[in-house]
Amino acid sequence: MASGWDERPPWRLESLRLLPPPPLLLLLLLLRSSAQAAHIKKAEATTTTVGGSEAAEGQFDHYYHEAALGEALEAAAAAGPPGLARLFSIGNSVEGRPLWVLRLTAGLGPPPTPAAVGLDAAGPLLPGRPQVKLVGNMHGDETVSRQVLVYLARELASGYRRGDPRLVRLLNTTDVYLLPSLNPDGFERAREGDCGLGDSGPPGTSGRDNSRGRDLNRSFPDQFSTGEPPSLDEVPEVRALIDWIRRNKFVLSGNLHGGSVVASYPFDDSPEHKTTGIYSKTSDDEVFRYLAKAYASNHPIMRTGEPHCPGDEEETFKDGITNGAHWYDVEGGMQDYNYVWANCFEITLELSCCKYPPASQLRQEWENNRESLITLIEKVHIGIKGFVKDSVTGSGLENATISVAGINHNITTGRFGDFHRLLIPGSYNLTAVSPGYMPLTINNIVVKEGPATEIDFSLQPTVMSVVPDSTEAVTTPGTVAVPNIPPGTPSSHQPIQPKDFHHHHFPDMEIFLRRFANEYPNITRLYSLGKSVESRELYVMEISDNPGVHEPGEPEFKYIGNMHGNEVVGRELLLNLIEYLCKNFGTDPEVTDLVRSTRIHLMPSMNPDGYEKSQEGDSISVVGRNNSNNFDLNRNFPDQFVPITDPTQPETIAVMSWVKAYPFVLSANLHGGSLVVNYPYDDNEQGVATYSKSPDDAVFQQIALSYSKENSQMFQGRPCKDMYLNEYFPHGITNGASWYNVPGGMQDWNYLQTNCFEVTIELGCVKYPFEKELPKYWEQNRRSLIQFMKQVHQGVKGFVLDATDGRGILNATLSVAEINHPVTTYKAGDYWRLLVPGTYKITASARGYNPVTKNVTVRSEGAIQVNFTLVRSSTDANNESKKGKGHSTSTDDTSDPTSKEFEALIKHLSAENGLEGFMLSSSSDLALYRYHSYKDLSEFLRGLVMNYPHITNLTTLGQSVEYRHIWSLEISNKPNISEPEEPKIRFVAGIHGNAPVGTELLLALAEFLCLNYKKNPVVTQLVDRTRIVIVPSLNPDGRERAQEKDCTSKTGHTNARGRDLDTDFTSNASQPETKAIIENLIQKQDFSLSIALDGGSVLVTYPYDKPVQTVENKETLKHLASLYANNHPSMHMGQPSCPNNSDENIPGGVMRGAEWHSHLGSMKDYSVTYGHCPEITVYTSCCYFPSAAQLPALWAENKKSLLSMLVEVHKGVHGLVKDKTGKPISKAVIVLNEGIRVHTKEGGYFHVLLAPGVHNINAIADGYQQQHSQVFVHHDAASSVVIVFDTDNRIFGLPRELVVTVSGATMSALILTACIIWCICSIKSNRHKDGFHRLRQHHDEYEDEIRMMSTGSKKSLLSHEFQDETDTEEETLYSSKH
């Protein structure tokens, strides 16, 4: 519409001669201008009110089909000033139509040049500005939303241009995104005038579904789904929307539909999936009701609650709103996905009874919804907003968690640390948490009606780890000073009792735990074992005077509560216990001594999902007992008598991984429903209720009594008289199976599979007592809880040591005569064995050592310390090998001070928190923000070499099919000089081009090492003593074809010829890439270790990928793989949780390649077989090609593991092979454990990685005698061995002396025989001299003579017939004729 400013004035210049004098003219002009301005203002106001925007008059008389939609959005954007709007597409529909989005917010600036495409065209995010999205036309035949969002776009843009105060304020403070049509294909199939009242056409022709017949609002991942997750390949529209949501931090959203007139809010479905009538409440139910009412109350029809839609005339909605599932159950809906998986609060808005009304009704529909739409957008500013920042640098912390006490729904901060938490008026306690920072809680934040309350969080960095440890101890600073009070000293001090007695739902429990971890950092460490089915953290609070560290000789104890979600007393008691221990440490002697001498782990809730479903006051029901997959966790552990066929649950897997990672000695599993301590076994082979005695039955009775006797009601043995009249437990304890049979129980698994003794404690007859009764439960159990923990210090404890070097022996076995239950040592050789008082015969044994047996008397007060020193069984064999022969010497010491210093460093880095300390001391972390194309990768590597020429060397191993270089970067202090005595490690990635995360991680590793060289002493020493080879991209051609954010596509998986390179490593490799790797990398046979990075899951595989019956050196290969997994924050838990296989369970995160994906021709198989180098494959992420925004997190997850490989390559066995003169022998063959072969390098050096333990070594070299020895490999240091060869004097496999003697005797015998024959011949010759002799006539005499003469001469027979010695012609002739 014209504004009037460009109209030509009605008067002409020629008429100036008719004008009045100047003063009067000026007055007339002023009057005319005022009138004209008033006219314009009136016209604009009329347009806004009636037309809804400055649109052409014809905009309400038709629908926007095909390209017209994009043109209409372009026109809407043009209605505003420059820099206000960006039009972009988030993807395409099945039929290739763009999914247009118009972004409207002030300050966007001009669009980029050249123009960006796709999501990149959206423009930059703006700090502190909340994002709102409105999505229309999800069902193609529900069309009103498609139109009103275009009208809304014009209204906002033109209103901002004309200076409407409300709209200017809105777009100056809000980031608005309008997506008019999510299903453009369906819209084109739909028919105007079809109100959806009946099935008026063939199936699939209504336009509701997409072109593949999929309902988009049933195709999102669902928290209550009962079947397989939807395949996003069938719904590219949903895939595009999910990707868009993940790339942003939307705060508020509306999903616009048709077919009724009502505002619907989450949840849209329930676990029961009842068709209708189930109110499925979210944790933010009040907020959602508030948002829905805000829309409905401004809609003239919706606010009545009586839409009177044809066919549903009687349907009513109070206040015009409804809970989605209460109306009808919708599984796979978009609004629930936004709330559960993103920061976004979304409601669904049904705009009209008729789904596709005639275009003549569009103006009225716009007028009905205009105010509601604008009001809903404004509601993004309610609640609390602010920033979470680093207190040191002031930078914003992305993905920090914001939790509200009492509301079980967290949100996370955006890219700039900004957050917007929607809340209704009230008072709230907010907590901000970010990994690596101390949590911070701000209490009593008042939210009022209107604009959000502004609160900023400034978090202090911390070195506290949130990952369970599994390694040995090192000393750490920061321990708290406590008075040195003897344990038995009486004190007038009364312990401080807990005051926090109420039921803690998950958000409250989370805040409670974080508060105590924050207030008592010197004795606490809060960490998580993983997540429940519904992604709640499985928290554990560690309490120790040295948190995060296993102190050799100190036992570890655990309590686990709330395994059954509706049995809640244990959960609350453990929270009380945390408060009690923290507040009394340093002042109460008993607590102080217990914390100083014990590492305590308290897990308040193993089943947080079940707890949230349980109801206060429950005594006997099973609601909430099971986890969210409806499995009883105490029937889910492997059992000795009964095969457990149920799938192992995430909570079970997490606990099993945890228990195997720590040297737990004693444990209790806290339950409810009775009042008794129950001890193993819990079941028996017959499956009937009868006593099932374990080998340690006496020990279990003793520790069970230690708890029950401190609880007077339990000790009486007659619990729950009102419920179970005949139930009686003498002294409050019982054998589990004697009570009732429980296959798959946790306590039996602890005892049978680990060193841990566990009992199950039933804490009360009421499973979920009322809150007012909680103080009574604490008072009844507090002494029992403390006394039971003290039992960890009963029996025998000590160390098993190596007699040669005094080191502790890992996994040595302690056996007690007549008790068939051995325990094993931890990393420092420390052990604990619970026993009742008495005299025992205890034997310590270890592979490669001679066992030692001692008689031990156990007292009733405290554990007795007994150390065992074992002698290596290989000593005698080595001494035998030295007698007159070559020999081998195993030693762990060196006289070189620098070598000793480096060995000490490796031991330190192998110890607990060693790598964490190293990483904290290194330079500030890297900024990974994008992927490197082949060109960028090449330039990056050249840049490293230019900047660090003294420690880097860049070479090409060959070229790909499309002639791209396969780069190899060596990092070493002498990169161009051979140093055979140094171990050599290679890192390779990108064998599958569609999985480039590994490539980026290796580039980050290279940059990290270069940046820290000569700045960080650890990096400097590792680079100086290691030859590090990095090959970041084995398949550069495939990488160029792959697409970012494509998590499942195989595009780029193969090389340019379509060959999977990981199937081409054979003796007749056909591809140039594999030939280059084989010839220039693997066949050099000088690497000690290889790490290959891939994608598609989160685990480590070890050889072989081909199906084989046995795996040589399996123990070592699995050890290397486990080392990587254990240093990864989640990999070791064995739950990749990949969308395509969410139930996958990988024990320890490690698996043999053939057991995961069996195939022939793999790189790691070839490396082991022909390169004699162990290789493991690390799968770094479920998504093959995640967005670049995830790279920093992936680097953080894998950094420690990658660095641990640089440490590990310096362990195993270092050897030198030489002869007696000291000359090194190269190319000698070293055979380990009769299987693995390596060759000595130049200078006689060899290095091989081996799992900790005793290993056999055979050395073979041409010309030398074979040598045999044994070597003991430590977990934290290399073992050195020197093999001295003696010259091999054997001939035909026999000793030289024997061969010479026999040969001499044989020659003597031959000479003697020849002499005898000569003498005999001479005598006979003399008898026939001087005459003729008669020839023999008789044949037998002739034969006798032949036999005699043939033994001494090989002359012809005729020469012996004539004996005359004359020499006449006649005689000669005569002889010749006979």
From Swiss-Prot:
This is Carboxypeptidase D. Glycans are attached at residues 172, 217, 399, 410, 429, 522, 626, 811, 855, 867, 879, 953, 976, 1068, 1140. The active site is at E350 (proton donor/acceptor), E762 (proton donor/acceptor). The keyword Protease applies. The gene is Cpd. A lipid is attached at C1315, C1319, C1321 (S-palmitoyl cysteine). The modification Phosphoserine is found at S270, S1356, S1359. It is an enzyme of class 3 (hydrolase). Residues 1-37 form the signal peptide. It catalyses: Releases C-terminal Arg and Lys from polypeptides. Its EC number is 3.4.17.22. Residues 1319-1378 are cytoplasmic.
